[in-house]
Swiss-Prot record:
UniProt binding sites for substrate: D378, S379, K554
Similarity comment: Belongs to the glycosyltransferase 18 family.
Topological type in the membrane: Single-pass type II membrane protein
Important for activity in FGF2 release: region residues: 264-269
Cytoplasmic face residues: 1-13
Protein name: Alpha-1,6-mannosylglycoprotein 6-beta-N-acetylglucosaminyltransferase A
Cross-referenced InterPro entries: GT18_cat, MGAT5_Glycosyltransferase, MGT5A-like_N
Amino acid sequence: MALFTPWKLSSQKLGFFLVTFGFIWGMMLLHFTIQQRTQPESSSMLREQILDLSKRYIKALAEENRNVVDGPYAGVMTAYDLKKTLAVLLDNILQRIGKLESKVDNLVVNGTGTNSTNSTTAVPSLVALEKINVADIINGAQEKCVLPPMDGYPHCEGKIKWMKDMWRSDPCYADYGVDGSTCSFFIYLSEVENWCPHLPWRAKNPYEEADHNSLAEIRTDFNILYSMMKKHEEFRWMRLRIRRMADAWIQAIKSLAEKQNLEKRKRKKVLVHLGLLTKESGFKIAETAFSGGPLGELVQWSDLITSLYLLGHDIRISASLAELKEIMKKVVGNRSGCPTVGDRIVELIYIDIVGLAQFKKTLGPSWVHYQCMLRVLDSFGTEPEFNHANYAQSKGHKTPWGKWNLNPQQFYTMFPHTPDNSFLGFVVEQHLNSSDIHHINEIKRQNQSLVYGKVDSFWKNKKIYLDIIHTYMEVHATVYGSSTKNIPSYVKNHGILSGRDLQFLLRETKLFVGLGFPYEGPAPLEAIANGCAFLNPKFNPPKSSKNTDFFIGKPTLRELTSQHPYAEVFIGRPHVWTVDLNNQEEVEDAVKAILNQKIEPYMPYEFTCEGMLQRINAFIEKQDFCHGQVMWPPLSALQVKLAEPGQSCKQVCQESQLICEPSFFQHLNKDKDMLKYKVTCQSSELAKDILVPSFDPKNKHCVFQGDLLLFSCAGAHPRHQRVCPCRDFIKGQVALCKDCL
């Protein structure tokens, strides 16, 4: 074991240690001396550096947000308010500056006893002032949010009230920047859901800007459409119709492009879902199309699809639930109360009543975000009274087809019979080729009539009426089937004819004879287009769901005054003679007059290919149910009429050769609006009813509409005068006013 030897301090080692210690002590003394002498300069420089960095920091933030307008919630489509963000940052910077300056000043005062007059006394008060303002902002205080006028945005006020109560019901509202303030509600409702006017100081929505990048260009061939429709056997009848009419369609789109500017139109993403052709619907329309089944819906669908395609829009066609789910898979199951952001799957949806139920079930909660895009093909129309679920229930209506709570103008009809809806229409087909057209003009009219009724039961109890006609001319028919018990023996029955053969027969014929059924079909228009006069049976009393089984369950109380109201009202004599079948003298006088007149073929423009293209293009470009403001038709078309008690707005407008325009009701729903048209309201109230706005002339009492979905051209008030918005229309294009294009 080694012994420990104690260390002995030599004089040499001691000297080295003392020298080293002395050197270190001297350097430290020198350092503190220099530091004390330069302290005032260092504190000043430090302050300047901090302030300079702060300025540069704020400047950098400003540069990064140069395109964002200042004000509350100035960031577009974000969950953050730039002012609040900067407030927090500035608050942090000011706190640090305050602490640093306090320490520096203490060093200066305590360390040197000089420079006690440094201009720092104002800083604490400035900092305190800033802290108060910053704290106010952080705690939710906002600068005053000046809201623009809400004229033209009838839903805005109601939506704001709803947001005040319900904005916490879904976290998605906060994600869009909603924080409980009116301004945040307004920004959300103007930029995300489009119910309110856009605030002028706000930057534009980048998603809306992106949406306008792709433009529609007209198409002049059908190759892509044929390929698309070939995949479905259900489309066979429609595909054949489109092929037959292809030349006429292409000529029509070229002609329309020469007459009006079809450039700079946004190319829309369009979904077409034919619910009636799905297997789940239970209908056999596609299967019976070639064997005498109903064709009206297929005619309208094929003409709509053709129009959308030629106008240059991107269309996707669905005829099964599987296809519908595949197209909409991105949003199926989305339970958010807010719409999805970014590239839209679809922007327009054409659908039928059957498909509507399928669409709602498929989308689930997401349905609400697509309601405004819907355009529902609805032959007989849906009146507001049946569309509004609560109102329909309160009236005891049990129709399976109504209660959708859409804007009534989203329902597209076969004829312009329901002004609360939109008139889509169809094209009356010309079945002739170029050589036929040359030959058909040489055909001489014979002293013969053709009866409109291909089913034997339509002829029941009509012999006396037909006997009168037979007194003056031959009677022909196109009845199919073995049963002919109701057909008089003198009738020459041709059976089912092809479209081409039917047109040649019509060219030989002077009179097309209505039997009272079917209602509102396309055949009378084909007859008139081939130079026939149409004998149109009058209904007295008018037929409706109140007295006719055929209309029971349909979502309308519309009254038909004749077999073909469109022909009666919008065409009339000399082409259309509306008569009471039970008045033998009236029938005989009409037949004599028709035999003594010479009329040319007439086709209303709205039932031609070009007319339909023009109308659908106007609807796509102008109709907008996803934004709050109603901008079309233009207000210049408004003509106000007062209906007498017991008279509907549809009637009073029609008497003046005008159309009731439901879009204008919102401009007649306030005291000040009434004054413009010399109606003075000494008192007023709100009511949720289809018969308002109305005016009681005895008491000068006005009743205004409390529910915008109940504005209705139909319905007559028993005591008040209804205040009615009418408009003019283009002859042969009823859906459009003279200033609408």
